[in-house]
Curated annotation (Swiss-Prot):
Name of the protein this chain belongs to: Ribonuclease Z
Pfam families documented for this protein: Lactamase_B (PF00753), Lactamase_B_2 (PF12706)
Record-level Gene Ontology MF annotations: 3'-tRNA processing endoribonuclease activity; zinc ion binding
Organism: Prochlorococcus marinus (strain NATL1A)
Cofactor comment text: Binds 2 Zn(2+) ions.
Taxonomy of the source species: Bacteria, Bacillati, Cyanobacteriota, Cyanophyceae, Synechococcales
Name of the gene: rnz
Length: 314
Protein backbone atom coordinates (compact mmCIF):
# COMPACT_ATOMS: atom_id res chain seq x y z
CA UNK A 1 0.00 0.00 0.00
CA UNK A 2 1.46 3.35 -1.04
CA UNK A 3 0.39 6.84 -0.02
CA UNK A 4 1.27 9.97 -2.03
CA UNK A 5 0.52 13.48 -0.79
CA UNK A 6 -0.55 15.91 -3.52
CA UNK A 7 -1.76 18.75 -1.29
CA UNK A 8 -0.86 19.50 2.32
CA UNK A 9 -1.95 23.12 2.90
CA UNK A 10 -5.18 24.24 4.55
CA UNK A 11 -7.53 26.83 3.09
CA UNK A 12 -5.42 28.17 0.26
CA UNK A 13 -2.38 26.94 -1.66
CA UNK A 14 1.10 28.27 -0.99
CA UNK A 15 4.22 28.32 -3.12
CA UNK A 16 5.25 24.87 -1.85
CA UNK A 17 1.97 23.32 -0.70
CA UNK A 18 -1.23 22.79 -2.66
CA UNK A 19 -4.58 22.32 -0.92
CA UNK A 20 -5.83 18.94 0.25
CA UNK A 21 -5.39 15.81 -1.85
CA UNK A 22 -3.88 12.42 -1.10
CA UNK A 23 -3.63 9.30 -3.26
CA UNK A 24 -3.64 5.70 -2.07
CA UNK A 25 -2.35 2.93 -4.32
CA UNK A 26 -3.86 -0.35 -3.09
CA UNK A 27 -1.41 -3.26 -3.01
CA UNK A 28 -1.17 -5.46 -6.11
CA UNK A 29 -3.56 -3.27 -8.11
CA UNK A 30 -3.14 -0.93 -11.04
CA UNK A 31 -5.66 1.55 -9.67
CA UNK A 32 -5.63 4.66 -7.49
CA UNK A 33 -7.93 5.93 -4.75
CA UNK A 34 -8.06 9.71 -4.31
CA UNK A 35 -8.84 11.27 -0.94
CA UNK A 36 -10.04 14.88 -1.27
CA UNK A 37 -9.49 16.96 -4.37
CA UNK A 38 -8.64 20.58 -3.74
CA UNK A 39 -8.11 23.11 -6.50
CA UNK A 40 -5.14 22.22 -8.70
CA UNK A 41 -5.09 18.52 -7.88
CA UNK A 42 -4.91 17.50 -11.54
CA UNK A 43 -1.84 19.74 -11.92
CA UNK A 44 -0.27 17.83 -9.04
CA UNK A 45 -0.97 14.57 -10.87
CA UNK A 46 0.91 15.92 -13.88
CA UNK A 47 3.87 16.79 -11.66
CA UNK A 48 3.88 13.34 -10.05
CA UNK A 49 4.34 9.80 -11.36
CA UNK A 50 0.60 9.11 -10.97
CA UNK A 51 -1.97 8.78 -13.75
CA UNK A 52 -5.46 10.27 -13.70
CA UNK A 53 -6.68 7.35 -15.80
CA UNK A 54 -6.02 4.95 -12.91
CA UNK A 55 -8.40 6.65 -10.48
CA UNK A 56 -11.19 4.23 -9.55
CA UNK A 57 -12.46 5.65 -6.27
CA UNK A 58 -12.65 9.15 -4.79
CA UNK A 59 -13.32 9.77 -1.10
CA UNK A 60 -14.34 13.28 -0.01
CA UNK A 61 -14.13 14.20 3.68
CA UNK A 62 -16.37 17.29 3.60
CA UNK A 63 -17.69 19.99 1.33
CA UNK A 64 -15.33 22.89 2.03
CA UNK A 65 -13.77 24.31 -1.11
CA UNK A 66 -10.15 23.48 -0.33
CA UNK A 67 -11.17 19.81 -0.43
CA UNK A 68 -13.48 19.74 -3.49
CA UNK A 69 -12.84 22.63 -5.89
CA UNK A 70 -10.48 20.54 -8.00
CA UNK A 71 -12.97 17.74 -8.50
CA UNK A 72 -15.11 18.99 -11.44
CA UNK A 73 -12.07 19.82 -13.55
CA UNK A 74 -10.36 16.56 -12.71
CA UNK A 75 -13.43 14.52 -13.66
CA UNK A 76 -13.80 16.47 -16.90
CA UNK A 77 -10.15 15.90 -17.82
CA UNK A 78 -10.52 12.18 -17.22
CA UNK A 79 -13.54 12.27 -19.52
CA UNK A 80 -11.62 14.05 -22.27
CA UNK A 81 -8.88 11.43 -22.07
CA UNK A 82 -11.50 8.74 -22.66
CA UNK A 83 -9.62 6.20 -20.60
CA UNK A 84 -11.91 5.59 -17.63
CA UNK A 85 -14.46 2.82 -17.31
CA UNK A 86 -16.11 4.49 -14.32
CA UNK A 87 -15.41 6.11 -10.95
CA UNK A 88 -17.09 5.62 -7.59
CA UNK A 89 -17.36 8.67 -5.34
CA UNK A 90 -17.87 8.52 -1.58
CA UNK A 91 -18.74 11.56 0.48
CA UNK A 92 -21.36 13.69 2.23
CA UNK A 93 -24.87 14.04 0.81
CA UNK A 94 -24.27 17.36 -1.06
CA UNK A 95 -21.43 15.88 -3.13
CA UNK A 96 -23.68 14.56 -5.91
CA UNK A 97 -25.53 17.85 -6.34
CA UNK A 98 -22.24 19.74 -6.43
CA UNK A 99 -20.80 17.57 -9.20
CA UNK A 100 -24.05 17.36 -11.17
CA UNK A 101 -24.45 21.14 -11.05
CA UNK A 102 -20.87 21.84 -12.14
CA UNK A 103 -21.08 19.42 -15.04
CA UNK A 104 -24.51 20.67 -16.13
CA UNK A 105 -23.68 24.37 -15.97
CA UNK A 106 -20.40 23.90 -17.83
CA UNK A 107 -22.07 21.69 -20.47
CA UNK A 108 -19.62 18.92 -19.63
CA UNK A 109 -20.38 15.39 -20.76
CA UNK A 110 -18.52 12.46 -19.28
CA UNK A 111 -17.91 9.37 -21.40
CA UNK A 112 -17.82 7.21 -18.29
CA UNK A 113 -20.10 6.56 -15.34
CA UNK A 114 -20.06 8.15 -11.89
CA UNK A 115 -21.53 6.26 -8.96
CA UNK A 116 -22.15 8.20 -5.75
CA UNK A 117 -22.19 6.72 -2.26
CA UNK A 118 -23.40 8.77 0.70
CA UNK A 119 -21.32 8.00 3.78
CA UNK A 120 -23.53 9.28 6.60
CA UNK A 121 -25.27 5.98 7.39
CA UNK A 122 -22.06 3.95 7.38
CA UNK A 123 -20.37 6.54 9.59
CA UNK A 124 -23.15 6.89 12.13
CA UNK A 125 -23.98 3.17 12.30
CA UNK A 126 -20.34 2.00 12.20
CA UNK A 127 -20.99 -0.05 9.07
CA UNK A 128 -18.42 -1.03 6.46
CA UNK A 129 -18.49 1.49 3.63
CA UNK A 130 -16.77 -0.70 1.02
CA UNK A 131 -15.44 -4.25 1.03
CA UNK A 132 -13.97 -6.77 -1.38
CA UNK A 133 -11.81 -9.86 -0.96
CA UNK A 134 -8.69 -7.86 -0.08
CA UNK A 135 -9.70 -4.49 1.34
CA UNK A 136 -12.32 -2.79 3.44
CA UNK A 137 -13.08 0.88 4.03
CA UNK A 138 -14.68 2.31 7.15
CA UNK A 139 -15.74 5.86 7.92
CA UNK A 140 -16.53 7.88 11.03
CA UNK A 141 -18.02 11.30 11.78
CA UNK A 142 -15.61 14.03 12.80
CA UNK A 143 -16.16 17.36 14.58
CA UNK A 144 -16.00 20.32 12.20
CA UNK A 145 -18.13 23.34 11.24
CA UNK A 146 -19.94 21.23 8.63
CA UNK A 147 -20.35 17.43 8.42
CA UNK A 148 -16.91 15.87 8.00
CA UNK A 149 -15.78 12.25 7.85
CA UNK A 150 -12.62 10.24 8.44
CA UNK A 151 -11.77 7.20 6.32
CA UNK A 152 -9.90 4.04 7.27
CA UNK A 153 -8.58 1.54 4.71
CA UNK A 154 -7.77 -1.94 6.01
CA UNK A 155 -5.91 -4.56 4.04
CA UNK A 156 -7.27 -7.94 5.07
CA UNK A 157 -5.10 -10.72 6.46
CA UNK A 158 -3.35 -12.54 3.65
CA UNK A 159 -2.37 -16.23 3.39
CA UNK A 160 1.13 -17.14 4.50
CA UNK A 161 3.95 -17.29 1.99
CA UNK A 162 3.80 -20.36 -0.25
CA UNK A 163 6.82 -22.68 -0.09
CA UNK A 164 7.30 -23.66 -3.74
CA UNK A 165 10.33 -25.85 -3.04
CA UNK A 166 8.44 -27.90 -0.49
CA UNK A 167 5.62 -28.43 -2.98
CA UNK A 168 8.11 -29.59 -5.62
CA UNK A 169 9.72 -32.02 -3.17
CA UNK A 170 6.28 -33.54 -2.61
CA UNK A 171 6.03 -34.09 -6.35
CA UNK A 172 3.28 -31.56 -6.91
CA UNK A 173 3.57 -30.30 -10.49
CA UNK A 174 3.59 -26.51 -10.99
CA UNK A 175 0.39 -25.00 -12.31
CA UNK A 176 -2.96 -23.64 -11.15
CA UNK A 177 -2.90 -26.06 -8.23
CA UNK A 178 -0.20 -23.89 -6.63
CA UNK A 179 -2.64 -20.98 -6.44
CA UNK A 180 -5.22 -23.22 -4.76
CA UNK A 181 -2.66 -24.37 -2.22
CA UNK A 182 -1.52 -20.81 -1.56
CA UNK A 183 -5.10 -19.90 -0.64
CA UNK A 184 -4.99 -22.69 1.94
CA UNK A 185 -7.37 -24.93 0.03
CA UNK A 186 -7.34 -28.72 -0.10
CA UNK A 187 -6.48 -30.16 -3.52
CA UNK A 188 -6.65 -33.62 -5.06
CA UNK A 189 -4.04 -34.50 -7.68
CA UNK A 190 -4.68 -36.73 -10.69
CA UNK A 191 -2.84 -39.58 -8.95
CA UNK A 192 -5.32 -39.41 -6.07
CA UNK A 193 -3.08 -37.79 -3.50
CA UNK A 194 -4.68 -35.08 -1.35
CA UNK A 195 -2.81 -32.09 0.04
CA UNK A 196 -3.85 -29.21 2.25
CA UNK A 197 -2.52 -25.76 1.47
CA UNK A 198 -1.74 -25.31 5.17
CA UNK A 199 1.16 -27.76 4.73
CA UNK A 200 2.93 -25.41 2.34
CA UNK A 201 2.09 -21.95 3.69
CA UNK A 202 3.67 -19.95 6.46
CA UNK A 203 1.62 -18.14 9.10
CA UNK A 204 -1.05 -15.72 7.87
CA UNK A 205 0.30 -12.23 7.12
CA UNK A 206 -1.57 -9.32 8.69
CA UNK A 207 -2.52 -6.50 6.36
CA UNK A 208 -1.73 -2.83 6.79
CA UNK A 209 -4.11 -0.01 7.65
CA UNK A 210 -4.28 3.72 6.91
CA UNK A 211 -6.53 6.40 8.41
CA UNK A 212 -7.18 9.79 6.77
CA UNK A 213 -8.57 12.23 9.31
CA UNK A 214 -9.46 15.83 8.32
CA UNK A 215 -11.03 18.36 9.01
CA UNK A 216 -11.71 18.07 12.71
CA UNK A 217 -11.01 19.36 16.16
CA UNK A 218 -10.03 16.80 18.82
CA UNK A 219 -12.75 14.15 19.07
CA UNK A 220 -13.10 10.65 20.49
CA UNK A 221 -14.44 9.48 17.14
CA UNK A 222 -11.03 10.11 15.57
CA UNK A 223 -9.39 7.99 18.25
CA UNK A 224 -11.85 5.15 17.76
CA UNK A 225 -11.45 4.85 13.99
CA UNK A 226 -7.66 5.15 14.26
CA UNK A 227 -7.03 2.41 16.83
CA UNK A 228 -3.85 0.43 16.11
CA UNK A 229 -3.60 1.76 12.56
CA UNK A 230 -0.23 1.48 10.86
CA UNK A 231 -0.52 5.05 9.61
CA UNK A 232 -2.64 7.96 10.79
CA UNK A 233 -2.75 10.98 8.50
CA UNK A 234 -4.22 13.75 10.63
CA UNK A 235 -4.84 17.41 10.06
CA UNK A 236 -2.60 19.81 11.99
CA UNK A 237 -3.87 23.22 11.00
CA UNK A 238 -2.59 25.11 14.03
CA UNK A 239 0.09 25.26 16.69
CA UNK A 240 -0.90 24.76 20.33
CA UNK A 241 -0.56 28.57 20.64
CA UNK A 242 -3.77 28.85 18.58
CA UNK A 243 -5.75 26.26 20.54
CA UNK A 244 -8.67 28.65 21.11
CA UNK A 245 -8.84 29.42 17.39
CA UNK A 246 -8.67 25.70 16.61
CA UNK A 247 -11.77 25.03 18.69
CA UNK A 248 -13.60 28.02 17.20
CA UNK A 249 -12.90 26.90 13.63
CA UNK A 250 -13.17 23.15 14.11
CA UNK A 251 -9.55 22.32 13.43
CA UNK A 252 -6.75 20.48 15.23
CA UNK A 253 -3.45 21.63 16.62
CA UNK A 254 -0.34 19.50 16.26
CA UNK A 255 -0.76 18.65 19.94
CA UNK A 256 -4.30 17.37 19.37
CA UNK A 257 -3.17 15.21 16.44
CA UNK A 258 -0.39 13.71 18.55
CA UNK A 259 -2.74 13.05 21.46
CA UNK A 260 -5.12 11.21 19.15
CA UNK A 261 -2.24 9.15 17.71
CA UNK A 262 -1.01 8.25 21.18
CA UNK A 263 -4.43 7.31 22.55
CA UNK A 264 -5.24 5.29 19.42
CA UNK A 265 -1.90 3.46 19.67
CA UNK A 266 -1.06 3.93 16.00
CA UNK A 267 2.36 3.10 14.58
CA UNK A 268 3.03 6.34 12.70
CA UNK A 269 1.53 9.82 12.52
CA UNK A 270 1.83 12.20 9.57
CA UNK A 271 0.73 15.81 9.99
CA UNK A 272 -1.00 17.49 7.06
CA UNK A 273 -3.39 20.40 6.32
CA UNK A 274 -0.99 23.02 7.70
CA UNK A 275 -2.08 26.64 7.92
CA UNK A 276 -0.32 28.89 5.37
CA UNK A 277 0.72 31.11 8.28
CA UNK A 278 3.39 28.56 9.18
CA UNK A 279 5.80 29.12 6.34
CA UNK A 280 9.58 28.93 6.79
CA UNK A 281 10.88 32.25 8.06
CA UNK A 282 7.77 33.12 10.08
CA UNK A 283 7.76 33.21 13.86
CA UNK A 284 6.26 29.71 13.88
CA UNK A 285 7.20 27.33 11.07
CA UNK A 286 6.20 23.77 10.10
CA UNK A 287 9.10 22.24 12.02
CA UNK A 288 7.74 23.83 15.20
CA UNK A 289 4.48 21.94 14.66
CA UNK A 290 6.46 18.77 14.06
CA UNK A 291 8.43 19.19 17.29
CA UNK A 292 5.23 19.99 19.15
CA UNK A 293 3.71 16.68 18.05
CA UNK A 294 6.88 14.63 18.55
CA UNK A 295 7.02 15.71 22.19
CA UNK A 296 3.86 13.62 22.66
CA UNK A 297 4.14 11.06 19.84
CA UNK A 298 7.76 10.61 18.71
CA UNK A 299 7.05 8.68 15.50
CA UNK A 300 5.62 11.71 13.74
CA UNK A 301 6.45 13.03 10.29
CA UNK A 302 5.50 16.22 8.48
CA UNK A 303 3.69 15.79 5.18
CA UNK A 304 4.87 17.71 2.15
CA UNK A 305 3.61 17.70 -1.40
CA UNK A 306 4.74 14.62 -3.38
CA UNK A 307 5.92 12.77 -0.28
CA UNK A 308 5.41 9.01 -0.81
CA UNK A 309 5.04 6.51 2.02
CA UNK A 310 5.14 2.74 1.50
CA UNK A 311 3.23 0.69 4.07
CA UNK A 312 4.42 -2.88 4.36
CA UNK A 313 4.52 -5.53 7.04
CA UNK A 314 7.19 -8.21 7.03
Amino acid sequence: MQVTFLGTSSGVPTLNRNVSAMVLKPPQRSELWLFDCGEGTQHQFIRSNLKLSQIKKIFITHMHGDHIYGLPGLLASIGLAGSSSGIELYGPAPLKNFIDSCLYNSSSRLAYSLKFHRVENAANNKEILFEDSELEVKTAPLKHRIPSFAYRVNQKTRPGRFDIEKAKLKGIPPGPVYADLQRGEEVRLEDGRIFSGKEFCGPPRPGVSMVYCTDTVYTESAIEISRKADLLIHESTYSYKETEMAYERGHSTATMAAQIAAKANVDQLILTHLSPRYTPGNQTCPNDLLNEAKAIFPNTQLAKDFLQIDLNKS
